[in-house]
């Protein structure tokens, strides 16, 4: 069972083999101007992405839905969501960004005022600082608890969902709170409500998620089919991205502070975390030169894979130099630490400047 509230590392191939997700490589060549996350295999799987490709090529309306979980600090692994949203913005999407304050309350015990504060200071400011203009007309940011359209739709959708179904998907038990059990229905409504007549009617919707969120996607698609006659819903599409590895193993997570580089870290803190991170190097320089490194097991290389945008040629050069033993870990780590320090020096200034806009988006 995949646990959407856990933080265990998943075997991505199992998702493809056992849950009906298709390899993204099958559609990559059809994607107009694919992003580096697509080209590098970070986005590894999809459901029905052909619909999104068709909409982009024909210039037809489509929407993107991806939420913020305001229960902890925003870390560098979250940046890939912003990078995807910036790409979809360029491709003409209408973007919906629910702030999951109801889920944060029910699943993680975060009260609503804290959710609002975390959303503003960590996530909205972070998204703006990373280059996404959240005040554009085609981008909609909202709190779940304040969106009556989402809440009303969720109530209707819940009429065709029962406890046994939720138990089978999420492992709910008799001790699970009603609020926690209702949270997935709110999320289903987040994903489906862009297709309501009030917002333009049925259209393709893409939901970029990590593999641990696939239970939500499967439930959403099942419920969309049940309400097709009433609303005309098109089954939402989804893409699946690999988790950035944590500094201590597993996936990077806000709930495990030692695993993450946070966007609110100072440049010095971010640099120090990179310098102390595990590499894929051998035990001695002699072995490194003779056997080469293992970039697939290196958080330093992974940092570049996820965050060094632009051409892939420089990244390929680093990979090959590591594998053939001509690039030593010390040099690579030093270069990456400098890259991260510069990135965070610029980001810290942008985050501070973004706070007034972040407050304005939620508080008016």
Swiss-Prot record:
Q: Gene3D superfamilies from the xrefs?
A: HUPs, Tyrosyl-Transfer RNA Synthetase
Which BP terms does GO give this entry?
Answer: tryptophanyl-tRNA aminoacylation
Q: Which GO terms describe its molecular function?
A: ATP binding; tryptophan-tRNA ligase activity
Q: Which Gene Ontology cellular-component terms appear in the entry?
A: cytoplasm
The record's annotation in SUPFAM superfamilies points to: Nucleotidylyl transferase (SSF52374)
Q: Provide an example Pfam family for this protein.
A: tRNA-synt_1b
Localisation: Cytoplasm
Q: 'HIGH' region: where is this motif?
A: 70-78
UniProt motif ('KMSKS' region) ranges: 251-255
Cited InterPro entries: aa-tRNA-synth_Ic, Rossmann-like_a/b/a_fold, Trp-tRNA-ligase, Tryptophan-tRNA-ligase_arc
EC annotation from Swiss-Prot or TrEMBL: 6.1.1.2
Where is this protein primarily located?
cytoplasm
- Look up the domain of life of the source: Archaea
Q: Where are the transmembrane segments?
A: none
Reactions accelerated catalytically: tRNA(Trp) + L-tryptophan + ATP = L-tryptophyl-tRNA(Trp) + AMP + diphosphate + H(+)
Keyword vocabulary terms for this entry: Aminoacyl-tRNA synthetase, ATP-binding, Cytoplasm, Ligase, Nucleotide-binding, Protein biosynthesis
In the record, the note on similarity to other proteins reads:
Belongs to the class-I aminoacyl-tRNA synthetase family.
Q: Which PANTHER family does the entry mention?
A: TRYPTOPHAN--TRNA LIGASE, TRYPTOPHANYL-TRNA SYNTHETASE
Q: What name does this protein carry?
A: Tryptophan--tRNA ligase
């Amino acid at each position: 069972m995949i646990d959407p509230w856990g933080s265990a590392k998943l075997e991505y191939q199992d998702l493809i083999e056992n849950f009906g997700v298709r390899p993204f490589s099958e559609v990559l060549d059809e994607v107009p101007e694919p992003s580096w996350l697509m080209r590098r295999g970070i986005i590894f799987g999809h459901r029905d992405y052909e619909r999104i490709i068709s909409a982009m090529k024909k210039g037809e309306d489509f929407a993107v839905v991806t939420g913020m979980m305001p229960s902890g600090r925003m870390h560098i692994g979250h940046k890939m969501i912003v990078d995807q949203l910036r790409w979809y913005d360029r491709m003409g999407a209408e973007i919906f960004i629910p702030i999951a304050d109801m889920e944060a309350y029910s699943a993680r015990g975060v009260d609503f005022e804290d959710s609002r504060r975390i959303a503003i200071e960590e996530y909205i400011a972070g998204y703006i600082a990373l280059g996404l203009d959240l005040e554009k007309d085609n981008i909609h940011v909202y709190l779940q608890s304040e969106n009556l359209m989402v809440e009303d739709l969720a109530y209707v959708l819940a009429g065709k969902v029962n406890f046994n179904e939720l138990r089978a998907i999420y492992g709910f038990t008799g001790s699970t709170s009603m609020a926690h059990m209702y949270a997935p229905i709110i999320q289903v409504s987040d994903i489906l409500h862009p297709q309501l007549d009030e917002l333009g009617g049925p259209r393709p919707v893409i939901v970029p998620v990590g593999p641990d969120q696939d239970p939500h996607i499967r439930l959403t698609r099942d419920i969309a089919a049940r309400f097709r006659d009433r609303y005309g819903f098109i089954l939402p599409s989804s893409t699946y991205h690999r988790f950035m590895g944590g500094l201590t193993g597993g996936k990077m997570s806000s709930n495990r502070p030692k695993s993450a580089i946070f966007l609110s870290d100072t440049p010095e803190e971010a640099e120090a975390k990179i310098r102390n991170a595990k590499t894929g190097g051998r035990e001695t320089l002699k072995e490194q030169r003779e056997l080469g490194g293992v970039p697939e097991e290196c958080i330093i290389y992974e940092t570049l894979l996820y965050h060094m945008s632009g051409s892939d040629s420089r990244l390929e050069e680093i990979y090959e130099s590591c594998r053939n033993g001509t690039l030593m870990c010390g040099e690579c780590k030093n270069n990456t630490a400098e890259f991260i320090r510069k990135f965070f020096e610029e980001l810290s200034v942008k985050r501070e400047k973004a706070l007034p806009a972040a407050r304005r988006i939620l508080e008016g």
